C-alpha cells in the first residue's frame, strides 16, 4: 500500500500498522505480472474469459493527483519535471478530483506515429535540463491501464472489470497524448492468438492477460496478471554496469545493465536481474 519503508517501520514500532492507508499523496509499489508461454497457460491460470491488453514497451509511470499531479517510476522516483506535457494531458483530459493511475509512457515517431523502443524515453527520464527541447524531440503518449484510487476512495479491492469501467468514464482519450490500453475480453484461444500477432505487427512487446475479477495487489507477482512476450532471437551483449542487491542479496551484484554494439558505440538495451540462481550468484 505504501512505498515509504520509514513510515512502515515507525508504525510497526508503535503497533499502528492498521493506520497505513492508500493516499494520492504517496506512491505505492506497482502490481507485477507473471510470465506465461501462451494463451492456453493464461486461461488455465486465470480462468475464462480473460482481458488481454497490448503490452507497451515504454516506461512504467504511476500518476498521483491530490493538490497537484506527480509522476513516479516503478522504483518510486519522482519524474514529474521530466514530463510537463503528460501533466498537462492529465489535467485536461482526466475528470476526477484525485486519483492514482497505473500507466506506461511510450515515445513515438513524429513522422510515422509508431512507438519507439524504451531506450528513447529513457533519455528523457535521465535529463535534468533542456526538458522542453527533449519533449519536442521525443514526444510521449501516456497509456493508462489501471486505477487504484478515485475521488477519496481506494479501489484496490475492486475488481479489474470495475476499475476499467471507472477509467473509461473519466478519461477523455486523445491519440498520441493520453489513451487507455487497447484490450479485448475473450475465452477463445484463436482470438487471443490473433490479438497477440496484431500486437507484434504494430510494434508492441506482446500482450498482458488479466483476470476480470482480480483485485490490485501492490508490489506482488500474482496470478491475477500474466504476460505473453515475443520470443526474440539470441543476442550477443556486454555488461556495462552492475548494481548491488538489497536484503538477502546485499553485497552481491544482482542487477546488470546490458548493451549491444551499434556501429562504433554501445547501445543500452536494458537491465537483467531475474534468473540468477543462488548456486551461481556467488560467481558475480
Short names for language-model regions:
Residues 126, 204-205, 231-236:
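Acidic, His- and aromatic-enriched active-site or binding-groove loops in soluble protein domains
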Residues 31-52, 56, 189-194, 211-247:
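Flexible, glycine/threonine-enriched loop-and-boundary segments that flank and lead into catalytic domains
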Amino acid at each position: 500500500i505504501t512505498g515509504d519503508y520509514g513510515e512502515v517501520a515507525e508504525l510497526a514500532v508503535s503497533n499502528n500498522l492498521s493506520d497505513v492507508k492508500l493516499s494520492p499523496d504517496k506512491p505505492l509499489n506497482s502490481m507485477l505480472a507473471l510470465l506465461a508461454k501462451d494463451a492456453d497457460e493464461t486461461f488455465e491460470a486465470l480462468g475464462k474469459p480473460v482481458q488481454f491488453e497490448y503490452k507497451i514497451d515504454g516506461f512504467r509511470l504511476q500518476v498521483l493527483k491530490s493538490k497537484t499531479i506527480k509522476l513516479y517510476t516503478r522504483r518510486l522516483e519522482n519524474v514529474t519535471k521530466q514530463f510537463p506535457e503528460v501533466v498537462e494531458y492529465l489535467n485536461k483530459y482526466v475528470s476526477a478530483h484525485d486519483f492514482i493511475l497505473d500507466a506506461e509512457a511510450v515515445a513515438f515517431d513524429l513522422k510515422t506515429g509508431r512507438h519507439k523502443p524504451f531506450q528513447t524515453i529513457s533519455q528523457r527520464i535521465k535529463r535534468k535540463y533542456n526538458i522542453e527541447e527533449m519533449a519536442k524531440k521525443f514526444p510521449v503518449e501516456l497509456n493508462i491501464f489501471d486505477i487504484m484510487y478515485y475521488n477519496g476512495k481506494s479501489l484496490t479491492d475492486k475488481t479489474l472489470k470495475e476499475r476499467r469501467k471507472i477509467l473509461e468514464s473519466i478519461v477523455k482519450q486523445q491519440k498520441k497524448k493520453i489513451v487507455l490500453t487497447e484490450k479485448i475480453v475473450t475465452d477463445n484461444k484463436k482470438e487471443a492468438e490473433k490479438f497477440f500477432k496484431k500486437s507484434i505487427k504494430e510494434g508492441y512487446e506482446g500482450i498482458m492477460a488479466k483476470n476480470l475479477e482480480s483485485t490490485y495487489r501492490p508490489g506482488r507477482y500474482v496470478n491475477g496478471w500474466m504476460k505473453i512476450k515475443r520470443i526474440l532471437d539470441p543476442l550477443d551483449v556486454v555488461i556495462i554496469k552492475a548494481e548491488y542487491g538489497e536484503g538477502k542479496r546485499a553485497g552481491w551484484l544482482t542487477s546488470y545493465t546490458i548493451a549491444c554494439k551499434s556501429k562504433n558505440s554501445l547501445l543500452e538495451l536494458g537491465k537483467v536481474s531475474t534468473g540468477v540462481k543462488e548456486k551461481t550468484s556467488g560467481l558475480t
